[in-house]
């Protein structure tokens, strides 16, 4: 338990991440589960809090909901926890996509289809949906 608390003293971990770290250090699985249950009961481990902190970090980096969702899943958080945190978020993803586009490309319009496609690919690669990208670039596909 001391090792787990020492790890948590440095930074926040999700349950699965901490479990992985402890197993890597050579602790037995039943002992790790018991320690994690104790730490969770005492409030040292909270996946919701961990997910919310990661969400804030990704929003600060102007990542879209798709990229945030993928990053949270890689940290070992379950889908229900991820969706709860994303739903509870008061982030305006459309405005975030627009600010990301302005920062990356400036206020100048795209010159030609090749440049438009490059901008769309960039924003979609940052986790924004097509609707959010179209809004950010003021792009009408029927134009």
List PLM regions with ranges.
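An alpha-helical, amphipathic repeat domain used for nucleic-acid recognition
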Residues: 1-143
């Amino acid at each position: 338990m001391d090792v787990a608390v020492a790890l948590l003293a440095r930074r926040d971990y999700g349950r699965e991440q901490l479990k992985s770290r402890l197993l890597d250090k050579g602790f037995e699985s039943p002992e790790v589960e018991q320690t994690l249950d104790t730490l969770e009961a005492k409030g040292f481990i909270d996946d919701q809090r961990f997910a919310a902190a990661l969400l804030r970090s990704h929003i600060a980096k102007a990542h879209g909901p798709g990229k945030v969702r993928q990053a949270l899943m890689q940290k070992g958080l379950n889908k229900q926890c991820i969706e709860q945190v994303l739903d509870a978020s008061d982030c305006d993803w459309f405005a975030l996509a627009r600010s990301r586009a302005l920062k990356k490309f400036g206020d100048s319009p795209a010159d030609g289809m090749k440049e438009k496609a490059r901008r769309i690919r960039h924003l979609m690669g940052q986790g924004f949906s097509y609707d959010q990208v179209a809004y950010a670039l003021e792009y009408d596909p029927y134009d």
